[in-house]
Amino acid sequence: MRYKIKNVIVESVKYILDPVVKGKKDFVPCDFRRNKILAGFAHGITGIVYAIAKAVKSINDLQKPEILQILNKLLKEENSLFDSEKMFWIDNRGEERKEALTTWCSGAMGILLGREEINKLNIGIVADKIKETREIVLNNAYILDYGNSLCHGCIGNLMLLKHLSSYDKKLLGIIEKMVKHLEKDYLKYGMQTGYKYNNPSLSFFLGIPGEIYGLIYLYYDENLPMILL
């Protein structure tokens, strides 16, 4: 069974990278807009490269120079969505390119997480823009208008900051500020979901269950699995 599962993983990696291998595209099509390159962990290139990098680390059949070359190429292509003058990642999902929120799913927070973890694997993939993305997080992680969800809210960002602080202690500086904001928010409004216009969602990543999980992680049990990685 293990051998069969290994083959499934290898074939899946080939399927994902096929457009680049055959020269049809310079990037891997993502969800939402299959004709566009997207940045991010949940919806973009960083998440795709991270998953494949973990597979390369574990499976000998995938430990090939050409695969590493493609993964490095994909990260460089994702860098095209970084505005170095205005210092933000671009959200390319809509009709117009706009500044991405500093969130896990499609913004700087998830990109920083993914790229730090990719480099930690030490398999020949170089994920850059770490310093710039960390700066964005330091300046903007607490500026959120979409509730407290894991996906793109305050709880998710706090969990990530706590995890990423092992890489950079400066990130601890904004955790206290965000916790005070969060506590004030809960006392005033109670649970809020991950939508701009609050809905009583019961989904894990967008709704109340994920908020409960995050609060337990932050206040009671930091040994809970880091569900966003």
Each predicted region: which residue ranges?
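Short coil/turn connectors between adjacent alpha-helices in alpha-solenoid helical repeat scaffolds
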Residues: M1-K4, S58-P65, L121-I125, S166-K170
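Active-site-adjacent structural elements in folded domains
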Residues: D31-K36, N92-E99, N140-D145, Y195-N198
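Intrinsically disordered, low-complexity segments enriched in Gly and acidic/Ser/Thr residues
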Residues: L138-H152, L161-I174
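Long, well-ordered core segments of solenoidal/helical folds
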Residues: N7-V28, L68-F88, I125-D145, G173-M191
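Solenoidal tandem-repeat scaffolds enriched in leucines and small polar residues
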Residues: M1-I59
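Well-ordered alpha-helical segments within folded domains of soluble proteins
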Residues: M1, I37-K54, E99-E117, N148-H163, ...
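Acidic, glycine-rich loop-and-beta core segments that form the ion-binding/anion-interacting portion
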Residues: T46-T103, A108, G114
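Terminal, non-catalytic domain-edge segments
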Residues: K54, S58, E117-L121, I125, ...
